[in-house]
Design a protein with these regions (language model features):
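Conserved substrate/cofactor phosphate-moiety recognition/catalytic segment
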Residues: 26-72
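Hydrophobic anchor at the beta1->P-loop junction of P-loop NTPases
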Residues: 13
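Conserved phosphate-donor/acceptor-positioning beta-strand/loop module used by diverse small-molecule
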Residues: 91, 106-126, 158
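P-loop (Walker A) phosphate-binding loop of NTP-binding proteins
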Residues: 16
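Glycine-rich phosphate-binding loop used to anchor ATP phosphates in small-molecule kinases
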Residues: 64-111
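Small-molecule kinase domains that catalyze NTP-dependent phosphoryl transfer to phosphate-bearing small molecules
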Residues: 128-162
Length: 162
């Protein structure tokens, strides 16, 4: 089934790890007539050496690299939208960084979709995945707290518990 063409736009799909961002963003992009899926994690993986991982209480270098990743993602999505595409950007953008990301995207319209399943469901999904998003100091509960208590209510928030 094809979705109506929103025309050139940026759609940011965000949420905690294992909330369904990749699945939702890919499914949305596949249903649009002219769309790209901008995966924020690709920019993180481009760093070959010197990468500083974002963990609780991260050093300034990790935060700077995260903000660079967001800038690159926003610029890439905006460039595609500027050429007539619907750019579906997907990344973990939480807390005060969500408002900052919205400011980075110059293209309008910009749609923000926040996936917010219950923590127990996130833990179940994480356990069933081939990759691990948690660890290195993050727990499902800690990241869920950042989502629900520190992230501004921008865009459409969806409980994707199922």
């Amino acid at each position: 089934m094809r979705a109506a063409d929103p025309g050139p736009a940026v759609v940011l799909v965000t949420g905690v790890m294992a909330s369904g961002k990749s699945t939702v963003a890919q499914a949305l992009a596949e249903r649009l007539p002219r769309a790209v899926h901008v995966r924020g994690d690709v920019f993180r993986r481009m760093v070959v050496s010197g990468r500083a991982e974002m963990v609780p209480g991260a050093y300034e270098e990790a935060a700077a690299q995260l903000r660079l990743r967001y800038r690159l993602s926003a610029m890439t999505a905006g460039a595609y939208a500027g050429e007539g595409w619907t750019a579906v950007a997907q990344d973990v953008v939480l807390g005060e960084e969500l408002a900052a990301y919205v400011e980075l995207v110059r293209t309008r319209p910009l749609y923000v979709v926040v996936l917010a399943p219950e923590p127990r469901v996130v833990a179940e999904r994480e356990a069933g995945r081939g990759k691990s998003g948690y660890g290195a100091g993050w727990t499902v509960e800690a990241l869920d707290r950042v989502l629900r208590e520190e992230t501004p209510r921008i865009g459409l928030w969806l409980d994707t518990t199922g």
